[in-house]
Amino acid sequence: MEYRDWTKKDGSGRDISTSLLGYGCMRFPTLPDGRIDEVRAEKLLNTARAAGVNYFDTAFPYHGGESEPFVGRVIAKWPRESFYLATKLPLWSCKTLDEAKDIFEKQFERLGVDYIDFYLLHSLHKARYDAAKEMGIVDWLWEQKAAGRIRNFGFSCHDNAAGFEHILRDQPWDFCQLQYNYLDTDDRAEEIAGDRGYALTEELNVPLIIMEPIKGGTLAQLPPDAAAPLNALDAYASAASWALRWAASHKNVKVVLSGMSAEDQLDDNLATFGDFRPMTDAENAAIRQTADVLRSHIKIGCTGCRYCMPCPMGVDIPDNFSIWNKLGMFGNKDAIRQQWTACFPDAEKAIHCVRCGKCEAVCPQHLPIRDSLAKLQTELDNL
């Protein structure tokens, strides 16, 4: 396993050395009723740890609130100093400092730990950060670090480069977390800090954790024309391994998170980071070609984070977007028609959207969800 040493120590004075591959605990395998398949998920976590993964990232809302308790039950069996635990405060659920304190304490109960190695303000944009600061939440969490309950304090961000810079420069953050992959490099998109954001972390020497390196799985399944430049260099490398290597080859990156939901995904990622090879100039050129092709295919930049769920009308928004993106990327109309008509529950289809806007208010990507749902319903119905 490849590790990255940090130049700074944590709040306890301990040296930090994180596995370059981090386990994202948002996409565990699930049972038919939607609950975490705890037997399979625990095996995945134990396999990852045995292979050297030591960074595990969860959050209060993951898996409908069940990720933290499940992770807590698993890590209770491990020596506490053998891993780093990261979780996040959902500021959209905090209207007051007292509400933030209540969630913070509940997280410790769920996780069953005395301290949290990496604590983040979750899914920040400028307005959300400014509100949290005004409520005193940011200052209070620095106090928790001073008290030893948090060892590293940072934030995850879904904002453009200007919003990210506003947040990053405002505090002496121990680290930050950005969505960064070879498709999300252009900071002109509202929710993407992109290359400018990455460069700023280097400039300010703030260690970076990367989330969505495979863009919610999108970059693990490339259409032939997009895969061609990469296959010309290495016909045996998986599409996911290219995406992970691209992210991990940036020198300020300390952890690349991957939400592994199946054994083959974990095995492939462990192989990538067990014998890690930084990207060459030729490989980076091929990645740029692949990205150009993909940008012409994807219908909407949904990562499947499910922050928009549940929909009051029962629409499964990420699943609707997932099948729509498959149509755009792969163009297999027969397969998509079969999936849409025979397998996709009618009660969860986009047609039931009443344009209430609740989803758009919480989408970290700031996607035009309502208009896109209407468009996809028409396209899929007319296959």
Predicted feature descriptions by range:
Residues Y62, E66, H158-D159, S261, ...:
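Short beta->alpha linker loops
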Residues I16, T47, A51, R110-L111, ...:
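Structural motif
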Residues R49, N54, R73, R196-L383:
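Structured C-terminal cap/extension of enzyme domains
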Residues M1-F83, W140, A146:
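N-terminal binding-site loop/beta-alpha segment at the start of enzyme catalytic domains
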Residues P32, W92-I209, I214, Q221-A228, ...:
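Glycine/proline-rich, positively charged
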Residues D5, T18-G22, N54-Y55, S82-K88, ...:
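Structural preference for beta-strand elements that scaffold enzyme active sites
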Residues G24, A59-Y62, Y119-H122, S156, ...:
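Conserved residues at the C-terminal ends of beta-strands
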Residues Y62, W78-L97, H122:
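Structural motif corresponding to the early beta-alpha repeats
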